Design a protein with these regions (language model features):
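Internal gly/pro-rich beta-alpha loop/helix module
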Residues: 63, 156, 171, 179, ...
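A phosphate-binding glycine/aspartate-rich beta-alpha loop in the early core of alpha/beta enzymes
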Residues: 256-319
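Conserved phosphate-binding catalytic cores of ATP/NTP-utilizing and phosphoryl-transfer enzymes
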Residues: 294-299, 348, 369-376, 401, ...
Length: 794
């Protein structure tokens, strides 16, 4: 018997080849009807045998297009037949009675790596897109970085500047073609092209956004696709030769510019570091294949899956001792950050290069990545020797994402290209649309709607005008794309954060909700894991403004989404010089030594102490004694810095977390022993004197610093477990949430999770959003939502 069904599919189902897929599946099962994009997702009407319709739904749920993400399939079966003669794809339309400004909302896909089908065409000499650097289809290519407005069609992307040729138009309009309504569709004949120029040349022209006269003349001479293909190939061959000759090339990609050089050329690496003012922070690498990466790093099956995933993040991998990548690429660490080519341009560039390339963000240190041609020409001309340009505009800058595998699963450390703007689906219902402004460092913002949390791409450190502009532009773009009108704004309680000042100055949002930094960390972990109710929250990081006006960072809470009760914390110590103590960890080492030994520590026969007079200890001691510019802190991150400096690892740093990263790298994992913190149960204060005494005693006794480093890590893991056990005994809680930048330390995280699980705890850590401050905005939004729903906020 013939019956009819209506099926609404919600999720990331538009712009990802979903309607052609539905058309093909319906035709295969001899079903009639129609499919169209609706304001809620994709609406399908099917008419035929009920068994075939059931089979269609089953296939839909298990074998959807690769870039889609189905969140729900709502079926209304056994409707009266409409006698459809065939199956057709209809144009998009609003639902009757709906207001587009209020209800039209469909998640937008991220930018995804080149798919297998496009890669085959890229290398097929008989294909008309052979070696075309911008090949794409509905299963891959740019999305977020080229969208200017919605609904998502070519006229609202930067591809509107390229009129499709007849062949591309035919594919674009063919429901059975995988380029059906693939908005970035292009080819040699009608799409973007490559150009190579020496740094500093044609500078005025790039300011105006056009091509140079030379480029324009060359472009006009190319009258057919074959000659354009030859020209693009020639540009790429020239670029390869320049890189292998030791030059630094700024290459325009999908979300911005990279600064690129030969990773095996120490002189090129050193030159890039010097020009970029990036002394030690590790560079990312790109290699043509997993096989090439395996020459330099250990790669597990899970890590290979992550490397080859459509998101194509930079994956942190364990470096092999046999690797010939210069240590200057990633000084002081045991890891290398590798990614595979994710765009056809990268695929073609690396095709004949049997070595990794440095592929670092195209920016001056501390500034956001360059994405506009004129901006890159101005900012990067003193860093790059050459520029490899293309003429497809980037609308939204996006950095590479960073991830790693831990405990068998992916954990995201920087969520950007390939992940954003896809929303984080949560167990929470956001009845109020909220803007959460995030933290100062590693900033992201978050906007909410329904069950979605739109955590932004990585913005960076909000410490200059350029990054603040990127932050504000990003917020407006997300509001426009997802039809969001936030009614509340959540922000960090630190009064000097630029994100806080922005929130307080936002006049159009009256409801303002301050959120304590470390409560936001714990809430972020809870939202990431889709759990509710009270947890034992452990928040450890560099610092965050506490409710008592001090700088927190070694905190234990009993927390839920509404409130956080501070149960225990590291003892407060002075931070002489304020932020200067972050850049100069020796200051914290001196503080902790004085805290443990008094001024008698100056008699200790330690190399650190012998060098202290030259570093200005008398001035520092005076500052501590008088409290001059000495904010108090309970930060675990600062304690890691102190131990690192005490062991002679790092007395000054050039990037955030460097001292702790190098301390972790040098720790002897095969050694035995651990240090013990003293806990004042009545006050919940955790004293570190015994740890410092033990470390000094070991050093004086000839224990290698690598063993001391390992014992310190185990001591912190033991502390976490001990406090959690005490809280469990008092409060009958058995769930522990670990959050904060300190838990990027894999040695500590592994040890802490193992001990907690051995003690019977259920342990929650981050996966979908970073454990560092990049996840703060999700926590802020979750807390604000809970407080609004509970009536804690008017």
């Amino acid at each position: 018997m013939v019956t009819r069904s209506e099926i609404l599919v919600r999720g990331i189902v538009q712009g990802v080849g979903f309607r052609p897929y539905v058309y093909t599946q319906a035709s295969r099962l001899d079903l009639r009807g129609r499919v169209r994009n609706s304001t809620g997702g994709v609406l399908i009407e099917l008419e035929g045998k009920q068994g075939d319709i059931v089979q269609f739904v089953a296939d839909l749920e298990t074998n959807a297009p690769p870039l889609s993400a189905i969140e729900s399939v709502e079926c209304n079966h056994y409707l009266a037949p409409a006698d459809y003669p065939d199956f057709v794809i209809l144009q998009s339309a609003e639902e009757p009675g709906e207001s587009a400004g209020e209800t039209q909302f469909v998640p937008i896909a991220a930018d995804f790596a080149t798919c297998i089908d496009c890669l085959k065409e890229l290398s097929d000499r008989s294909d008309r897109r052979y070696q075309y650097p911008f090949i794409n289809c509905t299963n891959c290519g740019p999305r977020f970085t080229i969208i200017e407005d919605i609904p998502y069609d070519r006229e609202r992307t930067t591809m509107r500047e390229f009129a499709m040729c007849a062949e591309c138009r035919s594919e674009y309009e063919n429901p059975l073609n995988r380029r059906f309504h693939a908005e970035p569709t292009a080819c040699h004949a009608c799409g973007p092209q490559l150009f190579l120029s020496k740094a500093g040349s044609d500078n005025e022209l790039f300011r105006s956004g056009g091509r140079s006269p030379l480029q324009e003349a060359a472009f006009r001479r190319l009258t057919n696709p074959a000659s354009k293909q030859v020209a693009n190939s020639g540009v790429l061959e020239q670029t390869r030769r320049l890189l292998l000759a030791g030059e630094v090339v700024a290459i325009k990609g999908i979300g911005g510019f990279h600064l690129v050089c030969d990773a095996l050329n120490p002189e090129a690496v050193a030159r890039l570091r010097g020009r970029k003012y990036r002394e030690d922070k590790p560079f990312a690498l790109m290699a043509a294949s997993v096989a090439l990466i395996r020459k330099h790093c250990e790669v597990s099956d899970e890590e290979e899956s992550l490397l080859t995933s459509p998101c194509r993040p930079i994956v942190l991998l364990e470096r092999k001792p046999s690797s010939n990548v210069p240590h200057a690429v990633a000084p002081g660490g045991n890891n290398l950050g590798f990614m595979l080519p994710y765009s056809p341009l990268h695929q073609l560039l690396l095709k004949d290069i049997d070595r990794p390339l440095v592929m670092t963000s195209g920016n001056v240190s501390d500034e956001p990545i360059c994405f506009a041609d004129n901006q890159a020409s101005d900012r990067l001309r003193e860093i790059a020797d050459y520029f490899l340009w293309h003429d497809r505009r980037i609308h939204m800058r996006t950095d590479d994402s960073v991830a790693r595998v831990h405990d068998g699963r992916e954990i995201v450390l920087r969520r950007s290209r390939g992940y954003a703007p896809e929303p984080i689906k949560t167990a929470l219902k956001f009845e109020t649309q909220i803007l959460a402004c995030g933290a100062e460092l590693k900033n992201t913002f978050c906007l909410t709607r329904d069950n979605y949390a739109f955590v932004s791409h990585h913005i960076g450190d909000l410490e200059n005008l350029e990054t603040l502009q990127s932050f504000t532009e990003g917020i407006e773009h997300f509001k426009r794309l997802f039809h969001l009108r936030p009614e509340a704004v959540a922000y960090d309680v630190h009064p000097e954060y630029l994100s806080t000042k922005y929130a307080l100055a936002t006049d159009e949002i009256a409801r303002k909700i301050p959120i304590q930094h470390h409560h936001a960390h714990i809430a972020s972990c809870m939202a990431d894991n889709e759990i509710e109710g009270e947890v034992i929250g452990v928040a450890m990081d560099g610092l965050g403004f506490g409710t008592d006006g001090r700088l927190w960072g070694g905190e234990f809470f009993v927390a839920d989404f509404v409130a956080a009760e501070r149960i225990a914390h590291l003892a407060n110590v002075p931070m002489p010089g304020g932020t200067k103590a972050i850049r100069e960890p020796w200051r914290m080492a001196a503080v902790y030594l004085q805290h443990a030994f008094g001024d008698e520590f100056l008699n200790l026969e330690l190399p650190f102490v012998k060098e202290l007079e030259q570093r200005g200890w008398p001035t520092l001691r005076s500052m501590i004694a008088t409290g001059t510019n000495c904010p108090e802190t309970s930060s675990m991150g600062r304690l890691f810095d102190a131990v690192s400096s005490l062991l002679g690892v790092r007395s000054t740093v050039n990037y955030e977390g460097q001292a702790a990263i190098e301390l972790e790298a040098m720790a002897d994992r095969d050694s035995l022993g651990e240090y013990e913190f003293r806990i004042d149960d009545s006050a919940g204060v955790i004293e570190s004197q015994d740890v410092i005494h033990s470390a000094v005693s070991d050093l004086l006794g000839g224990t290698p610093p690598a063993v001391v480093a390992a014992r310190f890590h185990r001591g912190v893991a033991r502390l976490i477990t001990t406090v959690a056990e005490q809280v469990r005994a008092q409060r009958k809680l058995n769930r522990v949430a670990l959050s904060g930048g300190v838990f990027q330390n894999m040695l500590l995280l592994t040890e802490a999770k193992w001990r907690l699980r051995a003690s019977g705890f259920e342990v929650f850590t981050h996966a979908r959003v970073p454990t560092n401050d990049g996840g703060i905005s999700l926590g802020q939004a979750s807390i604000a939502n809970a407080r609004i729903k509970s009536g804690r906020v008017n």
